[in-house]
Amino acid sequence: VKDRAAKAMILDGIARGALTHDKTIIDATSGNTGIAYAALGAALGYKVALCLPANATEERKKLMKLYGAEIIETDPLESSDGAYNECRRLVAEHPEKHFYPDQYNNDANWRAHFDGTAVEIWEQTEHRVTHFVAGTGTSGTFMGTSRGLKHLNPQVKSVFMQPDSPFHG
């Protein structure tokens, strides 16, 4: 589902004129959204740089690199916070060089799930969904899908899970 949010944030940036081909898409990630950014960047002709903890899986890093993304590894003991802080530092240093979707604070993230994921779940369950359970990271998937399902049926119950370790993703 992370490709939906990445696509929505990138298309929003293009529509607003904030993302142009002279800028690099940069964001913090623990992996999945980063893979989506890298794939979309390759398909649309944008450079991509991704800040992620050094303990992210090699498979994820390899996929990002295969799509041409620059990987900026951060201290694994700082978890996703370290990647987020490094990304913000790099953007502050050279804002003119970067398009920073900021998946943690971008309404296009949760809207992608409100408009897409929730509707798909609703239709695929033939309107019989009663509960929605999701893990949280940026909370975009959980917030958007929960809001969307509750918009379709206020009786739907939403439950979120949170990793018990800072080493998630």
Could you say what each language-model-derived stretch is?
Residues 1-169:
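PLP-dependent amino-acid enzyme catalytic core
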